[in-house]
Amino acid sequence: MADLQATLDSIYADIQPRIGEGKVADYIPELAKVDPQQFGMAIVTVDGKVYRVGNADTAFSIQSISKVFMLTLALGKVGEGLWKRVGREPSGSAFNSIVQLEHESGIPRNPFINAGAIAVSDVVMAGHAPREAIGELLRFVRYLADDESITIDDKVARSETQTGYRNFALANFMRAYRNLDHPVDHVLGVYFHQCALSMSCEQLARAGLFLAARGSNPTTGHSVVSPKRARRINALMLTCGHYDGSGDFAYHVGLPGKSGVGGGIFAVAPGIASIAVWSPGLNKVGNSQLGAAALEMLAARTGWSVFGD
């Protein structure tokens, strides 16, 4: 671990000439305003050490990475019963595909595509008003990161609400198949706010550390989930965490991870560290172009791939 900062510095040096690559998500107006000339990366090891480079302290919209935290909350509420509502298979389709949902009678393929995450939000809402469910998620993420300064960006949430026609279609579809219990606009209110969580690489790596450490946060002593559940969440991230680029990410990086269209990628080296990288420019399947490149370099230089070095 001693030379981890040197490894990060070398990755940053190699990435530097490429900063600005990829295309910023433009279908959410607030995200279209983000400066693409940014790159940050943070690693938190299971013994609590933090390593960072670049814009690692700049908060960004974590978007779909929030689905990992919502999934953790939903499993805490209903356990394995969740899998009656959502599958565990890679989709191979775009993250907002409607065709697959119709074909499979309103049961989304996995909890990380939009339809699956909307179903998960519906589960978390049980017994809550939308505002309470959003509050529960925010408290949970602050607890995980041990950081009360984490916020939800209302401008981004509003921006998504105004342009999220396809998500409304997905939710109405599931409601028609009786796979949503709450009114569509309530569920999507929660969903758009969870996606608008704003965190820095360091905050994100801290929040996800429990997944690298068998379900407990070694720095705070908080027990979050059982080792078995942490392992299973990691398995889902490895197979389904990057939309229809999941196989490619497993091939090149070999770590469980979850991407978001805000340009963030969260990744886990089980037993070793949690990693967050951010660069707003996306590749054609909606994953951070430089984020994925940096994680591939990290896996190659550390031997952390779950498939061995």
Curated annotation (Swiss-Prot):
It holds the Pfam family Glutaminase. InterPro entries: Beta-lactam/transpept-like, Glutaminase. It catalyses: L-glutamine + H2O = L-glutamate + NH4(+). GO terms for biological process: glutamate biosynthetic process; glutamine catabolic process. The keyword DNA-binding does not apply. Keywords: Hydrolase. GO terms for molecular function: glutaminase activity. Its EC number is 3.5.1.2. Gene3D superfamilies: DD-peptidase/beta-lactamase superfamily. It comes from the Bacteria. Substrate binds at S64, N114, E160, N167, Y191, Y243, V261. HAMAP family: Glutaminase. Belongs to the glutaminase family. Homotetramer. This is Glutaminase. The gene is glsA.
